[in-house]
Regions:
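C-terminal catalytic "cap/lid" subdomain
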Residues: 1-221
Length: 221
């Protein structure tokens, strides 16, 4: 998607786990657990170019890397679906999200993200869990939660902007959304945890590649 991406000199265990989980396939996200527990640095190199220093995976970034970059990287996947439930005064209804997640548990369906507003909540799921099950799942949500509105989006792509220094760097989100606006990409979903290790944006599948390139070029390209 991005031609000739720039190599990362250094990345933390937490950053590489986020990037791997969201599609950067150099290392499986579970492969980092044993070395992370004991703090062993990992050096990833290209077998066709062994003299290149490659990428070091470490517990903490060096001051040089912190000063030279705002994010660790950008990664994404395009195989997700989204269900949005709207209900007036949802915020006053104790256990609403608990019951929603209970429906997913009853159907053995894991969820990826759960962004919410005062009167609505969305769940993002891998599409593979919903094959042949959408109608039944939506019916159970209707019976359990009695929503005013229920929307199913069958295909959405997620892009993760990852970096431990984002929490200490003003303007990261503004830069992301400015790049997407300039590229003409409409954002369907935004999610960011309190740790600010990553920002997740959801876009239409047709916008996936242009969005990924726009964000990459804004920070790295």
């Amino acid at each position: 998607i991005v031609p000739n991406p720039r190599p990362m000199a250094e990345v933390t265990y937490a950053e590489i786990r986020e990037l791997s989980y969201m599609g950067a396939s150099v290392l499986h996200d579970e492969a980092m657990a044993p070395v992370r527990e004991v703090g062993i640095p990992v050096n990833i190199r290209n077998t066709n170019e062994p003299e290149h220093p490659g990428t070091r995976i470490v517990a903490e970034l060096s001051p040089e890397v912190i000063q030279s970059t705002q994010i660790a990287g950008v990664a994404g996947k395009s195989n997700f679906a989204m269900i949005t439930i709207g209900k007036h005064l949802m915020n006053r209804e104790v256990g609403f999200v608990y019951r929603l997640l209970g429906v997913l548990e009853h159907n053995d369906i894991p969820f990826e993200h759960c962004p919410s507003a005062i009167d609505s909540v969305s769940v993002v799921l891998e599409s593979r869990w919903l094959e042949g099950r959408v109608d039944g799942l939506l019916d159970e949500i209707r019976r359990t939660l009695e929503p005013d509105e229920l929307e199913y989006v069958p295909s959405i792509a997620l892009i993760a902007i990852v970096g431990e220094e984002m929490a200490r760097t003003p303007g990261i989100a503004a830069k992301v959304f400015s790049a997407l606006a300039t590229a003409g990409v409409n954002v369907r979903l935004i999610n960011q945890g309190a740790s600010e290790l990553n920002i997740i944006v959801g876009v239409a599948p047709d916008d996936y590649a242009p969005a990924l390139r726009a964000i990459y070029n804004a920070f790295i390209g």
